[in-house]
Amino acid sequence: EKENENMARVKSQKSQKRRKAFVRFLPIYILMLPGLIYLFINNYMPLPGLVIAFKQYNAGKGIYGSPWVGLKNFEYLFTTSDAFVITRNTILYNVAFIVINTTLAIAVAIILSELEGKRKKVYQSAILLPNLLSTVIIGYLVFAFFSVENGFINNTILKALGKDPVSWHSEPKYWPFILTFLRIWKGMGYGMVIYLATITGIDPSLYEAAVMDGATKWQQTKHITMPCIKPVLIMMLILDAGKIFYSDFGLFYQATGGIPASLYNVASTFDTYIYKAIQSSAPIGKTAAASFFQSVCCCATILLTNWLVKKVDEDSAII
């Protein structure tokens, strides 16, 4: 009986602790609630619709009443001439974005960490501001700069240099550089803030000891800053690798003015392909197959990247 009483007392104490912990963290749970609802609605509720990729979807029969076609929708995706173009563009653009964006974000964060006072906050805000801009606004900015008749570059810069105006939207050779610049300009501020916060959290005594030993700024960066931000850097790279088959639809579609035929080979990605396929009344099963393939590739990429990281440094892996 005493043992039963002791067990009951222990259980009662544990339940009380749980209740106290729940009440203590209730404000945090409430703050999490909108995000969890958004995640559930946008990421989990659509999951049953994955079967559309394997069906000849008929709106009248519904998702589960439509006939199965197996992998025929995927066959269509891989046999079309667009498959190579959209896969190549999506991967190459994302690799360029990750490498350049990460390098510049770390470099700018290190430079800003050396500044003090109002200048630091001004530079931080200026670099982060483009990240807050809508891609629609960026599309209008691109039009203002690259319009053939009224664009700033043609009417001001090229005119002053005595050069003929350029029909930018008819010249695909320029757009890999334009799109890369726009993506870095828009996205670098986010990474910079994360790396700057990590650098700010490094123990100042490490730098003080390095200065006393006569270490240069480069040596401090190499032997103190970089090792300290390494876990965050690896985590960011793994998360970026998970999005390597996704593209910024707004950037590619809005900045190019809807991807005209002249820019199709340099600006088409998985996301723009799916959108245009839906617009052209293509069978929903085929567009669902493209989206499903995209998701599977992203999942495989993040697992592969995490596995490689675990082989090199197990503590830095996120799974």
Segments from the language model and where they lie:
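Short, Lys/Arg-rich, polar N-terminal cytosolic tail immediately upstream
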Residues: 1-22
